[in-house]
């Protein structure tokens, strides 16, 4: 019985070492990819970045410069104002003067019997000039100025969808405790 318990303990320790080693390799690789400079030799397709905003004035003030100043040859940013009651419209107008590749529109207040988010996305898609569309949220900050390049490097003629993710930053507050 003692031999079986010892063998199980040894196997458990070996398994833990394996999992920690595997996790550390994945973590180190992801860290290296984030730090490396991105250089691409092939031509990058023009992109349309689409955001929907409903009362997101503070987030737009932070995220739009990070998106609009991406190191990418040709792209446009389309923000659909979804019936905001805060300063969203003012911020979009001010930033549109500074950034010529920023465009914005709005969803009508009278829209009923349809999801406002779906309507806003549809309007953004219809307003886009380019075939490749990138969707993001107003609370997802790009990790670097190469964010669009990193997304576009996976585009091929056979590609239909490229997915990315945004890590979750834990902050204080009751809402974040629930997540």
What is each residue range found by the language model?
Residues 121, 133:
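Short aromatic/hydrophobic "clamp" motif used to bind/position activated sugar donors
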Residues 64-65, 89-90, 130, 144-156:
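Short alpha-helix within the catalytic core of nucleotide-sugar-dependent glycosyltransferases
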Residues 64-110:
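Acidic donor-binding segment of Leloir-type glycosyltransferases
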Residues 45-48, 76:
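Cell-envelope/extracellular polymer assembly enzymes that use nucleotide-activated donors
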Residues 28-34, 56-69:
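Short, well-formed alpha-helical segments that are part of the catalytic scaffolds
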Residues 1-40:
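N-terminal membrane-anchoring/stem segments of glycan-assembly enzymes
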Residues 137-141:
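The conserved acidic donor/metal-binding loop of glycosyltransferases
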Residues 145-175:
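Conserved donor NDP-sugar-binding/catalytic core segment of glycosyltransferases
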